[in-house]
């Protein structure tokens, strides 16, 4: 749902071409008024507000500067353009004030519904459940064990990887005794991994 200010912007969003004859615009105004009344009867307040506002805006702001209205004089009282000017003036005098009252009534209804919807949406937003009795859980972080560099373990690891790579290069001599010796070297010289301790 939109507010009345947003609907006014929607109602003013149309093109006006002064080259179109005045009689066409007068028929268009009548069509806009009929659409507004149909939307109001269908209980579509937003759409009826847009059509009523567009009707008033077209008559008062756009058609008042139409070239056919500006170049008419009283001497051409028998021409069809004079009849269109009189029809335009009747719409301005008789219908526009009544439509303005309808617009104001619709504006109050739309703004009331819009504010109710906004407060309803604001009340339905989830809020954090803060209980005074609960205390936040504090996670204690255990310090990592301090271990300095052990040169002996490092050298042992390097020699282990060298033996493995040399054993893979010597694939030609793969007797049973070499395989068991390599397995024995693997078990004896595997680098020592740091021990993880978990406090409970």
Curated annotation (Swiss-Prot):
The keyword Ubl conjugation does not apply. It comes from the Eukaryota. Its main location: other. Keywords: Endosome, Protease inhibitor, Thiol protease inhibitor. One of its GO terms (molecular function) is enzyme inhibitor activity. Gene3D superfamilies: Phosphotransferase system, lactose/cellobiose-type IIA subunit. One of its GO terms (biological process) is ubiquitin recycling. Disulfide bonds: none annotated. One of its GO terms (cellular component) is endosome. Present with 377 molecules/cell in log phase SD medium. Belongs to the RFU1 family. Interacts with BRO1 and DOA4. Inhibitor of the DOA4 deubiquitinase involved in the regulation of protein degradation by the proteasome and maintenance of a normal level of free ubiquitin. PANTHER family: AMSH-LIKE PROTEASE, FI19924P1. This is Regulator of free ubiquitin chains 1.
């Amino acid at each position: 749902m939109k507010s009345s200010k947003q609907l006014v912007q929607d109602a003013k969003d149309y093109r006006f071409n002064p080259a179109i004859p005045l009689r066409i615009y007068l028929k268009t105004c009548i069509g806009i008024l009929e659409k507004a009344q149909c939307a109001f009867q269908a209980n579509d307040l937003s759409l009826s507000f847009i059509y009523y506002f567009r009707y008033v805006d077209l008559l008062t702001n756009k058609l008042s500067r139409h070239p056919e209205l500006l170049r008419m004089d009283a001497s051409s009282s028998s021409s069809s353009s004079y009849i269109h000017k009189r029809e335009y003036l009747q719409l301005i005098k008789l219908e526009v004030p009544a439509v303005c009252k309808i617009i104001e009534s619709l504006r109050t209804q739309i703004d009331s519904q819009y504010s109710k919807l906004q407060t309803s949406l604001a009340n339905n937003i989830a809020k954090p459940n803060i209980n005074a009795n609960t205390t936040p859980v504090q996670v204690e972080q255990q310090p990592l064990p301090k271990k300095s560099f052990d040169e002996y373990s490092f050298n042992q690891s390097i020699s282990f990887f060298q033996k493995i790579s040399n054993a893979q290069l010597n694939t030609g001599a793969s007797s049973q005794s070499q395989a068991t010796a390599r397995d024995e070297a693997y078990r004896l010289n595997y680098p020592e991994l740091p021990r993880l301790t978990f406090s409970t």
